[in-house]
Amino acid sequence: MSVYLTAATSTVAKTLSKQTALMLDQTVELPYFRAFEQPLVSLPELYRLIEAQIEQTSLKAGWSLNELNNVPILLGSTAYVIADCEYRKANGQPLPTQHSLSVIADYLQMRYGTQVFSFATSCTSSAQAVAYAAKMLENGLYNKALVIGFEMFNRLTFEHFHAMNLLSQAESYTPFSAPNGIVLGEGIACLALENQANSDTSCELLGISGLTDKQNLTNNSEDALRELIDRILSHAGLSAKQICAVKVHAVGGNSDEMEIRVLREMLPYSTWILAKPFVGHTLGASGAIETAFLFNAFEQGELPALNWQPHNEALPLAQYNPLTEGYYLNYFLGFGGSSAGWILKPQKIKNG
């Protein structure tokens, strides 16, 4: 049974801003993609944001809100309730007596009367949620599903990345072109999946695959990326020549060089789509947020323009060409060896 992405909405940063790191009581201003006004998002505010995204996406897909009790919700995040704990601490409120990833799922289950599933596989959390939602639809368990990826600023995550010397201090986020570190971001996205296309803007999901990298828990190995791409192409029944563009991982770190090498060798005919220079690395939310980024580009008929010139003009970046109808590879890599990906085939691209 086929699976289609029929609607996507997101709330992400509009511009690159700054966030203060406080490691060892030494303050330093680092670039950060801030999407929300609140320094720390409380749990009630997070519920409000998730509900608003669910409503926007459902209406965009042409669904009635009354049918959501038959639509499973799959959540993907890295932080889950950490921002709320920090909010409570900052405002002199007691911390939760129990710590559980299922707190948000329990609330949404009561709110909508449906099954809710939580995924925590580091940076691929919401990507894995997409993969499992698609499996549910393929196996006829449901006709529709919602996938939500969310990541809110919290100091625990931010300071840990800073302590590992992984964060960029540059004014622009230039992965692949001039990798100088990761720029983190916050945001939320919601994807609507169905077992049939409901409009010209629907995208078919093909070749959905996952892989666990057993070689390296903190970096992405070349062999694992090659195997992931092979699996996706094989499951989709496509050749490398048929892939018109690739939404790359491209975090701006040490793995960029390896990723570029693999793409040049395995997909020499494809252009590359960079998403993180516009939204930052949103960690567990990136699967949903970057898929929404790509889906919205299909609706607009073009990708947003980069605000910097590539240092390497030989990079085949898709940002400088109109989008065309065809097959788009979309993959995600994460700490702990988790990886996932699929191919999107839009039914129609505006002016495409």
State each model region's role.
Residues 1-116, 135-138, 154, 163-183, ...:
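Conserved "HGTGT" condensation-loop signature of ketosynthase/thiolase-family condensing enzymes
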Residues 120-122:
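Compositionally biased, intrinsically disordered linkers/stalks adjacent to structured regions
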Residues 126:
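Short conserved active-site loop signatures built around small residues
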Residues 130-134:
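Short, conserved alpha-helix that lines the donor NDP-sugar binding/gating region
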Residues 144, 149-153:
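Glycine-rich anion/phosphate-binding loop at the beta-strand->alpha-helix junction
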